[in-house]
Amino acid sequence: MQPTLLLLIAMTPDNVAQIAEHFHVIHAPTRAERDAAIARHGQDVRIVLTNGSTGLTGAEIAAMPKLELACALGAGYENIDVEAARARGVAVANGAGTNDACVADHAFGLLLATVRGIPKLDRSTRNGVWRDDIPLQPGVCGKRLGIVGLGTIGMQIARRAAGFDMQIGYHNRKPREGVSYRYFDALKDMADWADFLIVATPGGAQTKHLVDQTILEALGPNGYVVNIARGSVVDTAALEAAIRAGKLGGAGLDVYESEPKPPAGLLDLEQVVLTPHIAGWSPESVQATVDRFLENARGHLAGTGVVSPV
């Protein structure tokens, strides 16, 4: 008999079918379906597949006495109650490294689109406007890029920035060994120095509103911020206020605090480029995350352990 798996996130039919080759899948991607599935099948669930945004609460873990493994499909796991899981002997794993390149590509795409004003240039062109009537947008090559969170995704972003001859700085809790990029102990100092910030730090309570009014205004009226991390890291109200007041040049956001609803206060701002939390999604990267989940699950069930533990 196949182990019972509770799937809490939306996935394509092909991906669900691939997982269903190995597990009895209970697919519950909405809140109502989730609550009903745990109430009805909680006694049987051995594995949960979720993601960082959707998470898994301590109460839900307690309602599944046979639960052995909680997996986040991507790298983020900020809303999984890891302490509650460990207290009950539940292993926790994620998909670290599976979509780093895709996220970094998207981050740089947002940077280029925002700084160069590509979406608004596209709209103007479709409306018959020629270049002589359009204000010039700044370039990217040779500028100073500050990366907030130089983890595996941050390193991929830095590699792409090097191809644009950018000066690269980063802010972490501590310097990263073996890295020659300029380290900033204080984020404010990096914002003062940088032309652009790309936010690639984990979400959660420790980084909530890390990029606030002070940081945005330090970046300045010619500065731009890109967020491909978690919406909670950037103070949306402060971001809107800074752009409207001319204290920040613009922003490219794949994530925002109002998800899945778009950030209402930013929708009329042409200096803002928005995408629907899709930076890590491509056919290749999604397949890699599913493959990693299956690796983790097989390792756990075989007694050899997960490949990418949290």
Regions found by a protein language model. Give the residues of each.
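Short, Asp-centered acidic motifs that coordinate Mg2+ and/or phosphate
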Residues: 46-47, 69, 196, 224, ...
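Active-site regions of enzymes building and remodeling cell-envelope glycoconjugates
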Residues: 21-28, 89-90, 179-187, 269-273
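Short beta->alpha connector loops at strand-helix junctions that form conserved
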Residues: 28-29, 73-74, 90-101, 172, ...
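Phosphate-binding beta-alpha-beta segment of Rossmann-like dinucleotide-binding domains, i.e.
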Residues: 88, 95-144, 156-159, 163, ...
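An N-terminal-biased, well-structured beta-alpha scaffold segment characteristic
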Residues: 1-93, 212-217
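C-terminal helix-to-coil terminal segments
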Residues: 2, 86, 93-105, 259-310
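Rossmann-like adenosine-cofactor binding region
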Residues: 56-58, 173-265
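Glycine-rich Rossmann-fold phosphate-binding loop(s) that bind the pyrophosphate
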Residues: 150-151
